[in-house]
Amino acid sequence: MFIKVLGSAAGGGFPQWNCNCANCQGLRDGTIQAAPRTQSSIIVSDNGKEWVLCNASPDISQQIAHTPELNKAGVLRGTHIGGIILTDSQIDHTTGLLSLREGCPHQVWCTPEVHEDLSTGFPVFTMLRHWNGGLVHHPIAPQQPFTVDACPDLQFTAVPIASNAPPYSPYRDRPLPGHNVALFIENRRNGQTLFYAPGLGEPDEALLPWLQKADCLLIDGTVWQDDELQAAGVGRNTGRDMGHLALGDEHGMMALLASLPAKRKILIHINNTNPILNEQSPQRQALTQQGIEVSWDGMAITLQDTAC
C-alpha cells in the first residue's frame, strides 16, 4: 500500500494567513525550526499509479501541483485521482471539491449524514451539478467494507468515531454516528492495514479493536493541550469542543498511542498553535521518545509485508 500526505495541517494551514501566534510568527521570521504545512488530505494506492483521494483540502490545487504522481501524462486533460472519500463534512476537508470542478464527474464516497450537510448547509453537491455531472455520490455505511474501482486491492471500512459536526451544520454539538468516520484500509492482497483518523474526539471500546489491528496509524494530532487556543489567545473553543483529543493530556492521544502495537504512529491535522510544529520543542521531543512521528506535506509511506 502506498500513502502520500498531501497536507498535514489543520484548518487554516501553517502559518495561518491571519495569525501571529508564537508558531506562525516564529516560522515567518525564522526563529523556530519548522516547516510550512497545507491543510489535511492524503492519497492512497495499491499500485502507485492510480490513487484514491481521502478528503479534499482547500489547498488541493497547490497540493496536486506538488504531487507528480497525480499528473496523467499522454492525455490533454486527466488525473490519476480515481475516486474521493470524505471522512466528514468539515470545511477544511471538503472545500477542495470546488477546485476540482473542471474534472467532473467525480466519484465521491461518503456517509448519508455527510452528503446531507454537503447538499444543504454547504451545498457543494448541489452547486457542482452544473459541471459535467458534478459529484456522483456513493453512500457508505459504518463498518460495511467497500472498494473503489481505481484501486481494487484496497478495502475501505468506515468506522464511526466521536468528534463533532462542522459549525455550519444543524447537527453541531449533537452529531450522528455518520458525521465523523475513520477509515480502516486493508490491502487484500497482502494484509497491510492503515487506520486514518484526522479528527478523533474520544476513543471508545468499539474503536479499540480497529486501532489495535492496524499496522500503521495516521491519526489526529490537532492540539497538544485541550485549552491550547485559549492559552494562545486566538480562540475560545477547546480541543474537545472541536472534536479533537489533546495529545498531552493525562489520558490524551499520546497516552493512547503508547498503548497500541502499530509499528508506525504518525500524527496529521496539526493546528498552527500546536508546539509540536517547533521541531526543537520539548513536546516534539516527547513524541520522538515515544516513537510517534509528525507528518509533513509530501511525506510518503509504503506498507509492505504486513508492516510499515
UniProtKB/Swiss-Prot annotation:
The entry's keywords:
PQQ biosynthesis, Transport
Coiled-coil annotated spans? none
Gene3D superfamilies referenced in this protein's UniProt entry, alphabetically: Ribonuclease Z/Hydroxyacylglutathione hydrolase-like (3.60.15.10)
A Gene Ontology biological process annotation?
pyrroloquinoline quinone biosynthetic process
Q: Which InterPro entries match?
A: Metallo-B-lactamas, PQQ_synth_PqqB, RibonucZ/Hydroxyglut_hydro
Q: Which CDD domains match?
A: PQQB-like_MBL-fold
Pathway(s) the chain acts in: Cofactor biosynthesis; pyrroloquinoline quinone biosynthesis
The protein's job, in short, is: May be involved in the transport of PQQ or its precursor to the periplasm.
What PANTHER family does the record tag this protein with? COENZYME PQQ SYNTHESIS PROTEIN B, HYDROLASE C777.06C-RELATED-RELATED
Q: Which family does it belong to?
A: Belongs to the PqqB family.
The molecule here is called: Coenzyme PQQ synthesis protein B
* Annotated source species: Klebsiella pneumoniae subsp. pneumoniae (strain ATCC 700721 / MGH 78578)
Print the organism lineage: Bacteria, Pseudomonadati, Pseudomonadota, Gammaproteobacteria, Enterobacterales
Query: What gene is it encoded by?
Result: pqqB
